[in-house]
C-alpha cells in the first residue's frame, strides 16, 4: 500500500504558491495568465518525472496519465484546477492536484 509523503506534499504546495501575481496578498493565478502557464510548465515537469505521459488538450488542460498493470480493471480518474481566485489560499486547487 502506498502512503502520502507529507514533506513532498508540503514542498509541492509551496512550489506552486510561487506562481503568483499577488505575493504577500494570497495567491492569484488566473487562468491562462503568465503565472498559470508557469505553474502548468512546472507541474508538467513534475508529472513527467513521476513517470506519467503528459499532454495538453484543446482547451489547455494539462492531462497526466499512468497506465495500470491490469487492463481488465476500470480506469481511475481524478481532477482539480490549477487556477485560483484573486487573493486565494495556497491550497485552492493545489491539494486536489497533488493528492490526486
Each predicted region: which residue ranges?
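A non-catalytic alpha/beta surface segment that caps or lines the substrate-entry region
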Residues: 21-67
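Predominant activation on well-ordered alpha-helical scaffold segments within soluble catalytic domains
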Residues: 10-14, 44, 97-98
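N-terminal capping segment at the start of a domain
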Residues: 2-33
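A generic secondary-structure signal marking the coil-to-beta-strand transition
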Residues: 12, 60, 74-76
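Short glycine-enriched loops at secondary-structure junctions
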Residues: 9, 68-69, 82
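Alpha-helical metal-binding/catalytic segments enriched in His/Glu/Asp
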Residues: 78, 88-100
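Short coil/turn connectors at secondary-structure junctions
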Residues: 50, 71-76
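Glycine/charged-rich beta-loop-alpha catalytic/anionic-binding loops adjacent to active sites
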Residues: 74-86
Amino acid at each position: 500500500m502506498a502512503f502520502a509523503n507529507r514533506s513532498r506534499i508540503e514542498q509541492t504546495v509551496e512550489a506552486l504558491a510561487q506562481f503568483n501575481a499577488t505575493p504577500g496578498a494570497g495567491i492569484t493565478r488566473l487562468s491562462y495568465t503568465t503565472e498559470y502557464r508557469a505553474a502548468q510548465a512546472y507541474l508538467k515537469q513534475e508529472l513527467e518525472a513521476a513517470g506519467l505521459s503528459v499532454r495538453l488538450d484543446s482547451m489547455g488542460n494539462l492531462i497526466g496519465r499512468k497506465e495500470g498493470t491490469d487492463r481488465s480493471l476500470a480506469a481511475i480518474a481524478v481532477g482539480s484546477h490549477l487556477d485560483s481566485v484573486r487573493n486565494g489560499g495556497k491550497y485552492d486547487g493545489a491539494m486536489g492536484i497533488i493528492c490526486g
